[in-house]
Design a protein with these regions (language model features):
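GST-like domain detector, emphasizing the conserved glutathione-binding G-site
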Residues: 1-109
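GST-like fold's C-terminal all-alpha helical module
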Residues: 79-187
Length: 187
């Protein structure tokens, strides 16, 4: 959503569109019939189709650092959020369980258990699921400290104006800080 806001493009939000999501997860956009899934691919689509440069004003070095920071969020922090939402029973009941409302009750718990087992397997294969809760908390804390150090006292991560990395960071920070879910990062 932040990418669309930064680019100044009109949009409508629909958080229930998993059936149309080509990668089986959010986000995705429907740009006049062209479905684009994944936040990075959405960014590239906006840059290509609308000529918007999310990193305008950044030096080549800053562009590289911003891209690496985004990937650290997407390929590290993301999995800790998935772990917290899908593997913690209390968080699952508050959020992801609602994705299964359309499934009739007698089979709903079976489907939920199967999907959660699949997600645990994905987390194990990716690596996050192999860490103890204490190790996960330590890694998450270290990542949050690194992000805070990168931000410093600047209004945005790479200067006076928001860039693509800020849009990515905002989404993850908002998700992690949601009072609706328990996240060790807030503790």
């Amino acid at each position: 959503e932040m990418l669309l806001k930064l680019a100044g493009l009109p949009y409508q939000t629909n958080r229930g569109g998993f059936r149309r999501a080509p990668k089986g997860k959010l986000p995705y956009i429907d740009d006049n019939g062209e479905i684009v899934a994944d936040s990075t691919l959405i960014r590239l689509h906006i840059e290509r189709k609308y000529g918007f440069d999310f990193d305008a004003g950044l030096t080549p070095e800053q562009r590289g650092a911003a891209w690496m920071f985004e990937k650290a969020l997407e390929d590290h922090f993301y999995w800790h959020v998935v772990q917290a939402r899908w593997c913690d029973a209390e968080n699952f009941a508050k959020g992801p369980a609602s994705f299964f409302r359309a499934i009739p009750w007698p089979v709903r718990p079976i489907v939920q258990a199967a999907i959660r087992r699949k997600i645990r397997g994905t987390l194990h294969g990716q690596g996050t699921g192999r860490f103890t809760p204490q190790e996960q908390a330590q890694l998450l804390k270290r990542g949050a400290q690194a992000a805070a150090q990168l931000l410093g006292d600047k209004p945005y991560f790479f200067g006076a104006s928001p860039c693509g990395a800020d849009a990515t960071a905002f989404g993850f920070i908002a998700s992690a800080m949601s009072p609706h879910f328990h996240m060790t990062l807030r503790d």
